[in-house]
Structure formats: structure tokens, C-alpha cells
Amino acid sequence: MKKKKAAPHSRFNTARKISIFWTLFIGIGAVGGAVTMLVDPSGGLMGMDAMLPYFKKLPFADVLFTDFVFSGIALLIVNGITNLIAAALLFAKKKSGAVCSMIFGITLMLWICIQFYMFPFNFMSTSFFIFGFLQAATGYAAVIFYNQEHFVINEENYKNIGSDPTRLVVFFS
């Protein structure tokens, strides 16, 4: 009986699966939060109505932040739909999904930096800043691992390999 040769372990697939978790976790959460903000712009449904005065620190607060409609739309676009698109690309095993995961992790950290400016210290903002960092880090790792696993050496491009024993040729992946 012949044994099947095991497929080599793919670090890209491991990082890709972790990135899928982060993009779905953040994307679905953002869509849920955005829908709730759009259904109840006062913020009462999520217990956020007391947070609205903190938005007065932002530019155009008297126009954009009288309720949570603009915040809901921004959350849906910036953190919701984008992360779900990244998850779809990661499911398709595309390198662009890993790049998007990294970028959207950084975007989440920037989003949370605005919250650090607006709100007093709180567990939720700090947690999501860490989640953004972890998403960016796993996205970056997936990009690196993808590049390493798809690195190709074509010796025909290096015609003089072995012709001069005094010359050292080094390949980098």
C-alpha cells in the first residue's frame, strides 16, 4: 500500500486563516454596529446616546455629528464592507486579501486613535486597537509568507553560475 506524500506545511495558509478570522470578526461587528446606528440614529438602542456630546471635539460636529447617521455610514464603509471584501479575497487565497487585511488593520488602529482623542480611556477602544494591530500583523505575515512560497529561481537568468570559482552567488527569498 502506497502512502500519500503529505503536502508541505504552508505558513501562508496559517496566516491567511488567522487573517480571515480578524476580517470577519471586525467586518461583521462593524456592519452590525453600523446597521444599529442607522436604525436608531439617537444611539439609544446600543446605549451610546450619552457618547454623542464627545463628538463635539471633531470638526463639523454641528453638521455631521448631531446623531449617529454619519458615524454609522462611515463605520459601514471604512471597517465593515472593506473587511468583508478582504475576507472574500482571503477565502479565494489571493495575495491581495492579505494586503487588504494588513491595510484594514492599520485603518482600524487609526480609527481607534480618533476615539482615543474623543473619549475617555475605555476597555472597548483599547481592545479594538489591539485587534487592529493583530489584524495588521497577521496580514503582513501572510504577505511575507506568500512571497516566500511563490519565490522562483530561474537559473537561466544567471548564465555565469559555476563558471568562476572565485565568484559567490547568493540567492535571497
Ranges and model annotations:
Residues 2-173:
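Topology signature of small-to-medium multi-pass alpha-helical membrane proteins
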